[in-house]
Amino acid sequence: MPESVPELKNCPQQSSAAEALLDGANAAQREAIAHYLGPMLVLAGPGSGKTFTMIRRIQYLIQVHGVSPSTILVITFTKAAATEMQNRFCQTATEVAGQPQFGTFHSIFFSIIQKHCHYKISDLVTPAQQRMFIKQVLLNGTYGLPIDLDTMENLVSFISRYKNLGEEQTGEGLLTQEQFKKFYLQYQEQMEWHHKIDFDDMLLLCRQVLQKQKEVRELWQERFPFILVDEFQDINPLQYEILQMLAGQENNLFVVGDDDQAIYGFRGSKPEILLQFPKEYPDAIQVQLSCNYRSGNAIVESAQQVIRVNQVRFPKELKANRTGGKVKLVTFETPKEEQEKILQYLKHGVARKEQCAILCRTNRELLEWAKECEKRGIAYQHKVREKSPWEESCGKDLLAYLRLGLGNGSREDLLRILNKPMRYLSRESVGAERIDFVSMLQFYEGKREMQKRCRQLEQDLNKVGKMPAFLAVSDICRRVGYERWMLEQCHDEKSRATLLQLLEVCKKAAMQCKTVAELLALAEKEGKDNSSGGEMKVVDSPLSLMTYHASKGLEFTTVFLPGLNEGKVPHGKNLTPKEMEEERRMFYVAMTRAKENLYLTYLQSETQNTSRISPFLKPLIEYL
C-alpha cells in the first residue's frame, strides 16, 4: 500500500464526521460514500444523486479516512462537469489544506506529457492550425476532395476516430482505405514538422510514456492513489487503458456510470467497458443508486418499461422517491396539428414561467420547432446552431450545381461536384482560372470515353439552368444521379436517413421558388440570417429546445417528445441490434429529463408516410 494511503483509525472526531457525511443519504449512497480501498462500481440511474454521492465520498476519504486531498484524482468528460464538481466540493468542504485534482481526461493526461515529454500549451494545435495542415495535405496530394469546411470537419473526425480506435476504414465515403493511410501519414508529418499535437495525441503520448517508463508510471500512481471517474459509461478503450495504468495494483478505482445512459457510441465510447468492469475486477464492490429523486413515479415506471427491452445491460429496478408525475401518449393526424397543440400549451407554460422543453432526436427537427416558435412569438433557448440545410455538405453540392447551371458558377463549384457522382474526371482537367469545357475536352484528347463524360456533365448543367427550381433540384438528385451516389457513400442507415431528410428539406425549399435564381437568393439569405456562427441561442425563457444528446444531465418540469414515429425515433432504418439499443438509450435519457409532466406525441394517419408508431412506444401502450 502506498505511504499516502493511511490506515483507518477510530476516534470521536472521525465518528462525528462520518455521521454528518452519511446524514441524508440512502442505504446505497451510504455504502458508496463510506467505501475506502479497492475498486467500486456505482451504477447511478437518472436523478439518483450521483454528484452528491461522489462529493460526499471525497469528503469521507479526507475527513474520516484521513486521506490527503491532493492525492485524490477526480476525472470527468467535460470541463463544465469538472468545474461544477469542484465548485460543489469547495462549497461544502471544511477547512483542509489543499483540494483534490478535478479535471477532464485530456487535461489530466496533458499534465503528464507536459511534465515528462516537455510539451507546452503552445504545442497544442488550434482548430484553425489543424485545418490549415489538412488543407496543405489536400493541396499537395491527388485526393480529388473539395477543400471546404465540410471536408475539413469530416477529416478531423476521421483522424480522431483512427487515433482512438485504430479503425482503418475511417475514411470511408471520402477516401479509400489506402488513400486515408497516405493522407494520415502526411497529416502527421505536418504536425511533427510544426511540433504540434492534437487532443488525441495527448492520449497516445500519455499511454506511451506510462507504458515505457516504469518510474513515471509509479510516480503518478503514488501521487493519486485514489481515483474517481464520472460518467464511466462514456469511456473509450484508450482512455480506459491509461486509467488502469494510473490505478496500478492498488486499484482504488471508484467509477460511477449508467449503462442505460450510454449514448456516445459515435464518439468511440464503449459501454461494454462498464459492463465488463465486474469481470475485470472480481473483487470490485457494486452498488446501485436506484432511487430517483427527480421524477414522479409514473415517469420513472414508464421509462423503465422502455429500457427493459434492451438486452445488453445490468438489470435494475429503479424507484421514484415520490408519487405523482404524469405521462401522456398523444396522437395527432398531421404534423401541423401536432405543432399547434404543443405550442399552444407551451405558450401558456412560458407565461407561467414553467420550465419546459421540446426534445428531438436530430437538430434538423429542432430547427422546424424553432421556426414555429418564432412565428408565434414564443421565446426559447436553443442549444444548437441554427444551421441552414444549404450549409450542409449536400446543400452546398446542390447550390454548386445550380450556380454552374446558370453560368455563374466558380472553378471551386466545378471542382466540388466534378465527381459527384463519380465521373473519374481529373481535377487537373479543370482550368486554373475559369471554367472551360473546350479545354477539358482538349485535356482528354484521344480518350473518347472521358470526352463523352465531359460533354454529359456540360449538358446536365445546361439543362438544370433552364428548369424551374424544384425540377432542377429533383433532376440533379435523380437523373444526374447525385442522390444515389451520395447514398452509396453513407456507411450506415442513420447516415442515409439524415441525407434523405436533408435533401427533402432542400426540395421543399425549392418548391417555394419559381426559378433557380430565386432559390439561390433564398439560400444566400438563409446563410446570412444564420451568420451568427455556432453560438447557442440563449434568451431569458423557461422553454428549451434541444436534442436528446444535449439534454443529458438536465431536468425540466414538463417535457415534450414529439414526432415519435418509425424512421425518426429510432433515427434510421435497418439498424443493427447494437444501434437499436443505443437509440433506445437516447430515448430513455430524453424521457428521464421530465420531473412532473411527460408528453409523448406521434402521428397516426393513413395519409402520412410516417404513420407507423415508434417501436419504443409499444411497451408504453400496453403499460399505460
PLM features per residue range, with description:
Residues 2-9, 16, 21, 237-332:
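Conserved RecA-like helicase ATPase core segment
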Residues 101-111, 228-231, 256, 362, ...:
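Conserved helicase core region in the C-terminal RecA-like lobe
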Residues 42, 46-54, 58, 282-285, ...:
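Helicase P-loop NTPase motor core
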Residues 323-325, 349-472:
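ATPase/helicase motor core of nucleic-acid motors
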Residues 21-37, 238:
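N-terminal pre-P-loop "Q-motif" helix
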Residues 445-550, 571, 597-599:
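Accessory C-terminal helicase-associated subdomains
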Residues 2-19, 37-38, 46-48, 59-210, ...:
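A basic/glycine-biased coupling hinge at the interface between accessory DNA-binding modules
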Residues 220-237, 254:
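SF2 helicase catalytic motif II
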